[in-house]
Amino acid sequence: MSVLIALPKGRLLKEVQNLFKKIDIEFDIDSRKLIIDTSQKWLKVAILRTWDIPKFVNYGAADIGVVGKDILYESKLENNFYELMDLKIGNCRMSLASLDDKIPSNKKIKVASKYPEYTKKYFSSKSKDIDLLILKGAIEIAPILGISDCIVDLVQTGKTLKELSLIHISEPTRHPLI
């Protein structure tokens, strides 16, 4: 019997691979296979879209997974999992950003994000009424083009926000093993 671990595609995959190498688990991230053998006969990996990992673990298709707290929260499945450990990789923060340092207080706030649950929770905690525009990419351009007052998005270095003259308030996000 083997254990199947769901790993995220994209920039986190290399960090996870390096972490696994430290404990003598190696695998080929360039493999075209859907389920990849590792150097440990008892362990296999599936490289999946990050947003799908909580579902694969929840339905028992994968035994464990690596996913960000942001994705886990957005999946609405966070109460179904135990966080086994914080892998201390993929350091980023959830950022509320706008073209100036003030969010309108006298009107409904137009917010662009691909994190609707987090966004609703944040603004609800501030007793702010929002009009939420859910986007899948290029979130940063929404206030520049005038379709939102602000954005809620993940930020790693803040370089893109700075280049676009966006000002942000942030909260840490971690990537646990679930």
State each model region's role.
Residues I147-K159, L164-L166:
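A C-terminal functional module that forms or caps the active site or interfaces directly
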Residues Y59-G90:
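Glycine/small-residue-rich loop that forms an oxyanion/phosphate-binding "nest" at active or ligand-binding sites
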Residues D37-T38, A46-A62, S125-K126, A138-D149:
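Short helices/loops that flank or line small-molecule/ion binding pockets
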